[in-house]
Amino acid sequence: MFPANEVLQEKWRPDAYVLEAPFNKMVDEVESFALAKPFKCLINIQTIIENIDLAFDNETLIKNIKEPIFIMHAEDDGIIPFRLGKRLFDVAETNSCNARFFPFEKCLHLGHDNIYSADQFQEVVQVIINICR
């Protein structure tokens, strides 16, 4: 959602935000990455991320969005865990009455990159279009 941070600084605002497989915070994403787990006891990942200015704190950014927010996430996403997208939605829902979450079931085998190929994808897009009209 980093480009959204730039959009939030502009006077022009989009009609809605559509997020596909987002994460809530970079620190949570890094800590959920399998190769990072052995290092958790050796280093403070959060401090390192903050020191190199890579916090990508989407939870904070999303609190400033008043437009509708639509989040899509596949349950079998192996890159960004589903629970991180859901956690971001929970924050959005608390701050915006227009937040919607569209989960895609694990049995569809969509992973991180293939939500667009799901049969229900067109239905989700139509819902978004109808809400934004």
Residue ranges of model-derived segments:
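Hydrophobic/aromatic beta-strand patches that form the interior of the parallel beta-sheet core
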Residues: 18, 70-72, 102
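Short beta-strand/loop motif that positions the catalytic acidic residue
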Residues: 64-66, 70-73, 77
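Extracytoplasmic/secreted cell-surface and envelope-processing proteins
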Residues: 2, 80-81
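C-terminal catalytic histidine-bearing segment of alpha/beta-hydrolase fold enzymes
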Residues: 82-89, 94-133
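Hydrolase active-site cap/lid region
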Residues: 2-61, 67, 114-117
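Conserved beta-strand elements of beta-rich interaction domains across eukaryotes
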Residues: 24, 52, 76-77, 108-110
